[in-house]
């Protein structure tokens, strides 16, 4: 039997995609719309306080295309806290006009494929920064879920640890070409959601998403073993721009 990779696990992650019922939103009187926006911004202010205390992080992006209109990406130490945040959002007036489109539950993950040394990894500052990240405030985001293939000779889980480590090392070399251009956060979701991993990319240049994903398709680990779900791409929505976005 092949050896399972050990993982380092950090904050839990929720990608909460919603569509907006603009027709119903437009029917609200101006003062009710403004009250709903103010209530929502008060909730976001609580998220920002949590982030400033480094007890979690969040990002809000408007989604391009018809799959969704807005994304709330939330990181917290526990699954319970994610549920509390989701529930608090759903209780707001604004949520009456935010219809569920897609969601993804996972946990920030680092594998031992690239591990070395005997030091406790949870005590290494760089590892902690990656397990408990403050999300980048870049202009653009790209999210997609993925699996490793399990078909015939292309069964990832039948490869030896050494084979998997070498394939992932080569894959990582491709990713490092985009250092400074793209920030990547990998979240594990085996047993938590429908795919095995979620990949979230951040950049100030959306074209880099296309370049990175395309180049990685030629890595053997992706060409032979990668299976992908839907891709979501969006633009950052800063708190100060929320009133403008929801203005009618």
Curated annotation (Swiss-Prot):
Fe-coproporphyrin III binds at residues 130, 144-148, 171, 184, 222. Pfam families: Chlor_dismutase. Disulfide bonds: none annotated. GO terms for molecular function: heme binding; metal ion binding; oxidoreductase activity, acting on the CH-CH group of donors, oxygen as acceptor; peroxidase activity. Its EC number is 1.3.98.5. Fe-coproporphyrin III acts both as a substrate and a redox cofactor. Keywords: Heme, Heme biosynthesis, Iron, Metal-binding, Oxidoreductase. It comes from the Bacteria. It catalyses: Fe-coproporphyrin III + 2 H2O2 + 2 H(+) = heme b + 2 CO2 + 4 H2O; Fe-coproporphyrin III + H2O2 + H(+) = harderoheme III + CO2 + 2 H2O; harderoheme III + H2O2 + H(+) = heme b + CO2 + 2 H2O. Pathway: Porphyrin-containing compound metabolism; protoheme biosynthesis. The active site is at 144. Its cofactor is Fe-coproporphyrin III. Belongs to the ChdC family. Type 1 subfamily. Involved in coproporphyrin-dependent heme b biosynthesis. Catalyzes the decarboxylation of Fe-coproporphyrin III (coproheme) to heme b (protoheme IX), the last step of the pathway. The reaction occurs in a stepwise manner with a three-propionate intermediate. This is Coproheme decarboxylase. It comes from Geobacillus thermodenitrificans (strain NG80-2).
């Amino acid at each position: 039997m092949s050896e399972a990779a050990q993982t380092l696990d950090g904050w839990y992650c929720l990608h909460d995609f919603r569509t907006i019922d603009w027709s119903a939103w437009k029917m609200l009187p101006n003062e009710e719309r403004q009250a709903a926006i103010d209530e929502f911004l008060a909730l976001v202010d609580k998220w920002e306080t949590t982030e400033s205390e480094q007890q979690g992080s969040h990002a809000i992006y408007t989604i391009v295309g018809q799959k969704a209109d807005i994304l709330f990406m939330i990181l917290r130490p526990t699954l319970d806290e994610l549920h509390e945040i989701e529930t608090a959002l759903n209780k707001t007036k604004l949520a009456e006009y935010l219809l569920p489109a897609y969601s993804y539950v996972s946990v920030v993950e680092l594998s031992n494929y690239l591990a070395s040394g005997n030091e406790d990894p949870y005590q290494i500052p760089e590892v902690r920064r990656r397990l408990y990240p403050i999300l980048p405030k870049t202009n653009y985001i790209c999210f997609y879920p993925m699996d490793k293939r399990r078909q015939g000779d292309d069964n990832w889980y039948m490869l030896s640890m050494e084979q998997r480590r070498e394939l992932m090392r080569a894959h990582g070399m491709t990713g490092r070409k985009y250092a400074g251009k793209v920030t990547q956060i990998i979240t594990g979701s085996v047993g938590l959601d429908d795919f095995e991993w979620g990949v979230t990319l951040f950049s100030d240049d959306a074209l880099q998403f296309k370049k990175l994903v395309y180049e990685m398709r030629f890595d053997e680990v992706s060409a032979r073993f990668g299976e992908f779900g839907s891709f979501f791409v969006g633009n950052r929505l800063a708190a100060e721009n929320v009133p403008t976005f929801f203005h009618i």
